[in-house]
């Protein structure tokens, strides 16, 4: 890639979308035949909510018969925002049989199913993503797709399923990124000792790695702190602020977006600070075109309802709960967090009368 192309990509994953768009446009001016430049520009335009320009960029890439996993994935995210179900499936189909692309798009599709609470379908598509990567002997990629699935299970309250999937991933790869996500999943599942040990080891071995020490480790440590000291969780997350809109490695498509904000919102909820919590969870709506099918975006809607209850804004709380339950109208009925949401919403009804 050119210097402009490299910078456009780096700025995109750092969440600096305006600058990324400028660099990516210059890269394309100099060489309009490189697929990833189009992907960077689609990503940047989508983050900026300039959806027409993003769509035009996807179309331009198609006219040049250009494609790679990054570009197809970015166009997939655009189709999700536009609620174009047929386009989503076409993009998944377009990656079929292509090394390094098929598994990426399948994992993307699994996040879409999870966004709507369809866990069984999400698991099945994740299984296909894992198998696709393994067929290409890309064992770390396979493990990461398995961990993406495990992370969703942990967030949905399916802790045993999450642990089972983590064990499966470790059988595929023992890479740094695999252990990093393992630590986060364990933290989100309440396994304090094992997670803490992994986090300490990663921080010691990679002291200069920004993604590890300013995004992943603080997010996991804050998740652990939630169980004993909400104020400490908020303090630990302070260092993540400049990188909140980033997609740091290991990149799991959109499944990790705004993780520090989500955990910070949880900490404020536990402190009883509904207004502050709502501000964090509202970020998923504010950055909807960047969050796309991140399953946390759906859960943030539920957390908004909980936040509004703390501020005695009952009508807003009821609306937030209703919007979450509408999103999950076809969800698998046995998901723990769905049971909780329905029970909370049922109790809310008399308060609103």
PLM features: residue spans?
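Alpha-helical repeat scaffolds
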Residues: 21-26, 51-63, 84-98, 121-132, ...
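TPR alpha-solenoid repeat register
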Residues: 3, 37, 70-71, 105, ...
């Amino acid at each position: 890639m050119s210097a402009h192309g490299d910078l456009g990509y780096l700025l995109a994953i750092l969440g600096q979308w305006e600058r990324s768009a400028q660099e990516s446009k210059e890269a394309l001016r100099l060489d309009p035949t490189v697929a990833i430049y189009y992907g960077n520009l689609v990503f940047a335009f989508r983050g900026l909510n300039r959806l027409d320009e993003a769509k035009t960029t996807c179309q331009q890439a198609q006219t040049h018969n250009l494609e790679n996993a990054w570009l197809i994935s970015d166009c997939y995210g655009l189709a999700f925002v536009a609620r174009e179900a047929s386009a989503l499936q076409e993009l998944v189909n377009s990656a079929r049989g292509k090394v390094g692309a098929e598994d990426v798009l399948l994992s993307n599709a699994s996040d879409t199913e999870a966004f709507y609470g369809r866990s069984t379908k999400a698991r099945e598509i994740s299984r296909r993503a894992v198998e696709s990567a393994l067929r290409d002997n890309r064992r770390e990629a396979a493990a990461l797709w398995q961990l993406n699935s495990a992370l969703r299970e942990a967030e949905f309250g399916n802790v045993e399923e999450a642990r089972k999937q983590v064990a499966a991933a470790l059988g595929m790869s023992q890479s740094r990124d695999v252990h990093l996500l393992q630590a986060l999943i364990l933290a989100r599942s309440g396994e304090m000792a094992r997670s803490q040990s992994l986090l300490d080891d990663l921080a010691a071995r990679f002291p200069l790695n920004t993604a590890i020490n300013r995004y992943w480790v603080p997010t996991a440590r804050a998740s652990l702190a939630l169980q004993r000291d909400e104020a400490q969780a908020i303090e630990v997350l302070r260092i993540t602020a400049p990188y909140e809109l980033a997609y740091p490695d290991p990149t799991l498509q959109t499944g990790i977006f705004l993780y520090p904000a989500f955990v910070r919102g949880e900490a404020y909820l536990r402190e009883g600070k509904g207004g502050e919590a709502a501000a964090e969870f509202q970020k998923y709506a504010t950055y909807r075109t960047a969050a796309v099918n991140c399953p946390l975006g759906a859960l943030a809607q539920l957390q908004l309802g909980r936040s509004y209850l703390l501020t005695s804004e009952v009508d807003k709380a009821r609306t937030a709960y209703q919007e979450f339950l509408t999103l999950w109208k076809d969800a698998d009925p046995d998901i723990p967090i769905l049971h909780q949401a329905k029970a909370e919403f049922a109790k809310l009804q008399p308060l609103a009368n």
